[in-house]
Amino acid sequence: MSSAAQSDGNLLAAKSRRLGEHLRSLGRLLVAYSGGVDSAFLAWAAYRELGDDMLAVLADSPSLARSQMQDAVAFAQERGIPLAIIQTAEMERSEYRKNDGFRCFYCKDELFTVMEQFRAEHGFSVIAYGVNTDDQGDHRPGQGAARQHGVAAPLLAAGLSKQEIRELARAADLRIWDKPASACLSSRIEYGREVTPEA
């Protein structure tokens, strides 16, 4: 192994340890879970560190493809990750249906509002989601909603990039390590065109 490769490996191992330490510091944890690489790896890592003091929360929404939802449920079951399915109603919000450049804000605001109610009712301490270092700097209104709701970002706190998350997932033999990125169904509708369940 070259010294550069060894250095990269040491850095990634350090980030993985940092992630574990951060997760343990959060207490009873809800993870916003969609089945994508980031949220699936975060849910797995949280379960590894916290056991039954974590719960992955999957939103059953018209904007989530049925095949993606089924795969998300299957992955959680395969890994023994505790899972709850909640209902969100972003389609009932006129500002979401309007489909301007802030649609993702209203979607995440709906998600985190419902998760916050769930958190309070079931005695969890913190909500976390799977944003990473590559998500910084783009137009990401959903991150604004996360900040407003005080949602933790453990992968970001550990300094993990998308590629590093894939590498750690592969090392852990998680089948999602090479899963392609997949946007929600609503993102396939051009801005300015109303979003409806039928669109």
Mark where each language-model region is.
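ATP-dependent adenylation/nucleotidyltransferase module used to activate substrates
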Residues: 2-171
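Mid-to-C-terminal catalytic subdomains of enzymes
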Residues: 156-199
